[in-house]
A protein has these predicted regions:
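Substrate-binding cleft of secreted/luminal carbohydrate-active enzymes
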Residues: 2-32, 47-50, 246-350, 421-436, ...
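N-terminal carbohydrate-binding/catalytic regions of secreted carbohydrate-active enzymes
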Residues: 16-133, 294, 375
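Glycoside hydrolase catalytic-domain groove-lining segments
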Residues: 78, 216-259
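Active-site groove signature of glycoside hydrolases
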Residues: 128-158, 181-188
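A short beta-strand element within beta-rich, extracytoplasmic domains
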Residues: 336-348, 352-381, 416-420
Length: 459
């Protein structure tokens, strides 16, 4: 079989996906990959850290379940799941189980963390040490920082919130330079060319790696305490063309509570077409919020009878079309011939080196299978064929590629490439692999999988 060296390259506009928040539980990456057919650049998970509060480390809505609450952010601290790392932390629990799951599946961790601005340097150092093994991840610290709903904005002035961001950033960079920081603040002040709270956040803007805003084309921000009816006030809807400044959008959607399921599709697709048509390419990426939602902000909504069950929404099919648009998906470039053994490098979903196997097809297959024997049995692999991605976990010896040929049928003879990449098998980079271990992971592939492609039924 002919094999080639390949390189993952960035999309023109990257897609990240929210997975778990105050509005929904984390959904495992095996399920999401099966539903959507391809990975994202990154997966955003949302946690909080308020170690001085008497309710800590409980999730605050559980600690205060007998308290009369009329707004989602009226609790003593933010109702995200608690970040259980830090000093004397437990790396066997959340968010680390989720972070490892995300990276095994060839995606970057985007950790959103709301944090008490009074935490000590020692506590920040401990969090930074937690993040060292997770490669080229992103940290969105104290997002929507120019708002007034999160607990950290009620414990400090905006200048103090900004100064805390700078302090955290500087400590983080000394310990975990592999982590890129995201400063998520407001956009331009209405009728002005100045950034909201520009004076207070000037130093934070200079220090951060990435600047972003959150933008909902429609949102019922009274959820879950108010239904978005025409006569109610706690919902808004924006014209998509008002979002026209260079930015990373860290939370994006149109709320089905406001638009309904069909206008939600139209609004999101209109915005994506606008992004594609813009000659300045002002948007580097956006995070769709989110996969499964307790309200109507999800590709699925949570079944109220069973939170392990998601109810697919019409937006999911439209979102799959967006994911498969060349503008929004990473590229795979062929870099010349290869011979075994080959060392594969995993840097990120936008910068990794793999191999491609040429597969000659007579027509659409009836069976399309791969068997992983010998040293490959313990490999952790992400694979792509005919536009669809598949995951092979360590210990798995068989993968069925036929789903790639259900919708993407081959009408005649064709050569397709089976692309193979090797993200970290444990979800963490290996410090024994050399000086660049913070940002790269290596795996030597010594043999190829045994392929079975058949074009007629057995009987």
């Amino acid at each position: 079989m002919k094999i080639s060296k390949t390189q993952l390259t960035p999309a023109k506009c990257a897609l990240d996906l929210g997975d778990g928040s105050e509005r929904g539980l984390y959904v495992n990456q095996d399920y999401i990959l099966r539903k959507l057919g391809r990975p994202h650049r990154g997966i955003n998970i949302m946690y909080c850290y308020y170690p001085f509060d008497k309710e800590w480390p409980q999730r605050v809505s559980e600690a205060c379940k007998d308290t009369n609450i009329s707004f989602a952010w009226d609790y003593p601290y933010d109702d995200y799941f608690p970040y259980r790392g830090g000093i004397d932390g437990n790396h066997d629990g959340e968010p680390f189980t989720c972070m490892r799951d995300i990276r095994k599946h060839g995606q970057e961790v985007v950790l959103t963390l709301t944090c008490d601005p009074n935490v000590t340097d020692e506590q920040i150092e401990a969090i930074a040490k937690d993040l060292v093994p997770y490669g080229r991840m992103m940290l969105r610290l104290n997002h929507e920082a120019t708002g007034d709903w999160f607990s950290f904005t009620k414990r400090a002035s905006y200048k103090q919130v900004a100064d805390f961001y700078v302090r955290f950033q500087r400590i983080l960079k000394k310990i975990a330079p592999n982590v890129s920081t995201i400063l998520c603040i407001g956009g331009l002040e209405p009728g002005s060319d100045k950034i909201e709270k520009e004076a207070e956040f000037a130093e934070a803007v200079k220090e951060t790696d990435i600047w972003s805003v959150d933008q909902y084309l429609s949102l019922n921000w009274g959820w879950p305490y108010e239904v978005a009816l025409k006569d109610n006030s706690k919902h808004k809807r924006s014209n998509t063309k008002e979002v026209n400044k260079p930015m990373l959008i860290s939370e994006f959607n149109a709320d089905g509570d406001v638009t309904g399921p069909f206008d939600q599709i139209a609004t999101v697709k209109e915005f994506c077409e606008y992004i594609k048509a813009d000659s300045e390419n002002w948007l580097s990426g956006f995070t769709f919020y989110q996969f499964r939602d307790d309200g109507r902000l999800g590709l699925e909504i949570t079944d109220p009878n069973n939170s392990d069950v998601g109810v697919e929404q019409p937006i999911l099919g439209a979102y799959k079309e967006i994911m498969n648009d060349d503008f929004f998906k990473q590229g795979i470039e062929v870099k010349g011939d290869a011979e075994l053994p080959v060392t594969l490098r995993w840097g990120s979903s936008e910068d990794s080196e793999g191999i491609a196997i040429d597969v000659d097809l007579e027509k659409n297959p009836v069976f399309a299978e791969a068997y992983f024997e010998g040293s490959l049995a313990d490999a952790n692999l992400m694979m792509e064929i005919n536009g669809q991605w598949f995951y092979k976990a360590p210990g798995v010896k068989f993968v069925d590629f036929m789903p790639a040929f259900f919708d993407g049928k081959i009408s005649g003879p064709k050569t397709v490439k089976l692309n193979i990449f090797a993200p970290p098998a444990t979800g963490e980079n290996d410090p024994s692999q050399g000086e660049d271990w913070l940002t790269n992971y290596y795996y030597e592939i010594k043999e190829l999988p045994r392929l079975r492609f058949e074009f007629e039924p057995v009987m």
